Swiss-Prot record:
GO BP terms in the entry: translation
Gene3D superfamilies the record matches: Ribosomal protein L9, C-terminal domain, Ribosomal protein L9, N-terminal domain
Keywords, sorted A to Z: Ribonucleoprotein, Ribosomal protein, RNA-binding, rRNA-binding
InterPro entries, alphabetized: Ribosomal_bL9 (IPR000244), Ribosomal_bL9/RNase_H1_N (IPR009027), Ribosomal_bL9_bac/chp (IPR020594), Ribosomal_bL9_C (IPR020069), Ribosomal_bL9_C_sf (IPR036791), Ribosomal_bL9_N (IPR020070), Ribosomal_bL9_N_sf (IPR036935)
Superkingdom to which the source organism belongs: Bacteria
Family stated for the protein in its record: Belongs to the bacterial ribosomal protein bL9 family.
UniProt entry tagged with the keyword RNA-binding: yes
Protein name: Large ribosomal subunit protein bL9
HAMAP family cross-referenced by the UniProt entry: Ribosomal_bL9 (MF_00503)
Phylogenetic classification of the source organism: Bacteria, Pseudomonadati, Thermodesulfobacteriota, Desulfuromonadia, Geobacterales
Biological function: Binds to the 23S rRNA.
One Pfam family hit: Ribosomal_L9_N
GO MF term list: rRNA binding; structural constituent of ribosome
Keyword Ribonucleoprotein belongs to the record: yes
Amino acid sequence: MKVILKENVENLGHIGDIVKVAPGYARNYLIPRNFAIEATEKNAKALEHAKRQLEYKRNKVLEQARLLVAKIEGLSLSISHQAGEEGKLFGSVTNMELAELLKAQGVEIDRKKIVLAEPIKHVGEFTAVVKVHPEVAANLKVVVTKAE
């Protein structure tokens, strides 16, 4: 019996694969647990349609992410912190502060998507990576100055 997988099934296949299985395995395990549907012409067409819609949405989200990356890379954030004589900050610049500065610039990003290679604890220029999408990331320029 041929079935179309709706979930990834170990040792069988991935979502959307059409696989041949024993009729009992399909009727008693895969179909009742909603892991698969019977591979009919109608179901195959519905699967193709769903794949096209998913691909369209994925491309649209990716395009929006690329536009956001272009906007972020055009920005340079300036932040002033209290610092000692040698330029060492009292505390550090966190991704939460960077997220608030981005929000003030009109770019709303979750703080967890801002990755600092190392904590910013000195005055100077730094680069933070903003993971906008799993496939797209932006480099954000951060300038830290000493507060007077």
